[in-house]
Amino acid sequence: MNRVAKLASLAVLCHTISAGIVPPALAQARQQDPAAIARRNATETELESIAIIERKVMVPMRDGKRMQADIYRPKDESKKYPIIFVRTPYNFNYWDVELGAPRDMSAPLEAIKHGYAYIEMNERGRYFSEGDYDILGVPLTDSDDALDWMGELPWSLDKVGLIGCSSTAEWQLAVASRGNKALTTFIPESFGAGVGRVGPYFEQGNWFRGGAVQMLFGSWLYDYGLLTDDGHPKFPPGISHEALVTAAKSYDLSAHPPTIDWSKALQHLPEKDIYATIGAPHGIFADATPSGKPGMITRTPNDPSWYQGGLWNDSMRIDLPGLWLMTWYDVSIGPNLAAYNYVRSTASPAIAAEQFAVIAPVAHCSYKRAAEHTIVGERDMGDARLDYDALTYGWFDHFLKGEDNGILAKTPKVRYYTMGSNKWQSSDTWPPEGAKPVTYYLTSGGHANSLYGDGSLLAAPDPKDSPDKFVYDPMNPVPTHGGGFCCLGAEYKPGALDQRSLEMREDVLVYSTGPLKEGIEVSGPIDATLYVASDAKDTDFTVKLIEVLPDGTAYNIEENIQRVRYREGYTRPPVWMEKGKVYKVTFQPMQTSIYFAPAHQLRIEISSSNFPQFDRNLNTGGDNYNESQGILAHNEVHHSAQYPSSITLSVVKR
């Protein structure tokens, strides 16, 4: 049944139930996994035995629209309870229509066992929530209204804590800045999509990196049915609660679009029309948002529209205890750490002391997938497990229940995993105490192209300038191969992958140290500076930090990009390049913690593309998103005492 037919049938179903006639279930369950069904049913049965459950509760907002919530609370009605609140654009409907069983109810079950009420709510315009969906949780007043409503529930302790990962976390920072009296603490996980501008980072919710577009939204918006509001059911006014519950058990409202090979679809030019090739509407990607803001692909990094929605930025003070969970191979570890440090530096002293961070060595939202051998991409990171449930419930017990459980005293301010040595470490700050900048300078005989070139890294600049040259062709970009990203489709795997296949290319410059005599721990920011030239009006430069093992395996650690038109910043007009001139280009800081063992090597890769993690610069100086033709760019990297292209690492001596 297609989506239009589904919604038409759903409307008939709701009308029929409202009339008092209960039809047979309309969805055909695919009971292909009896063991999973048994587990799900057992969890639901246990939950029903200890919880009062209210599903499809419609919560009114100030404009009259209603947001749908599921409420779980302990059965002992003689007490009041703090609330763990999860709000999401994703489908948390309690019934898995296709499986013919409840969804995994482990999260509310654990909350009840720990003495909490647990409320899940869909964002405006998603699933059973009314109104029009607008990306990044706007309007922010929906959060205020939901928190006020929770504080007034007769069994509520008027203390609410937030938790969630990715798009279930992105709204938390902006809401935490609003000072709602019921909101007591927050635990954002992989929350970069909620960080607009902070310090040197103008990523605007993971949309940009260094002024280049991160293409993950191209696939994510489509795969989750977020481009338009067309698929959102419009229920009859006054529809009964019974009808909503029955509809939830009969219809899967999740988007199920045809599977797309994003490695091909994202190549389409112009960028604004990528959905035309797959028969999907442009929607909020290229047309407009429901609130009338311009399509996202048409905006620049400092477009006023970014500051009119649900993104948090560093003009918004947060005075709320926070437990920040991050990962090294996430989409935006740099802005995430910058946001954490910003709150620590600007909150009141008492609240600043209540900011804690955990940084795991995994990909986006993969905290609990760590194992005895935690494989991230292709690399074994060792045993990176951490008891996140003990940490988060210990945190909530302290701040929501007022328990003197010592969680703050026994938890380090920053707990981070050092890859290579494969161990958890602790610090009072990020970067860690004792981290010192160590700079390596790029040099070559003018032929650093590919793994077989003559590029190297020195402790001091080479007096002589022998620039390395390569041709960047936007029709043949360097392909994304591992890294910190998500949501690009099955064709692209995040994490640490062997980069030697890319290092065969002539448009990839390779600079390496010799085998290290002593081990080096790099924990903290990584700053790259290049002196570049081009015959194009505008182009991009990329940088990638690599660890080379004695057998030659070259694992990517961190990567970055800079669109040269923004080399003077994002609040100024773009500036163009002129042939024959050399320009200094700095990159926003990268972040990592990695131990380079003796006999391993440090390596830097330089190029002008990393596609489709980042969109291609077509080199014309035009808007890029609305162009169908690119031109070749003949690019140069200079390195000398006059042009000290370099990489500066934060080195910690133990």
Report each predicted region and the residues it spans:
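N-terminal cap/lid segment of alpha/beta-hydrolase-fold proteins
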Residues: 37-77, 512-518
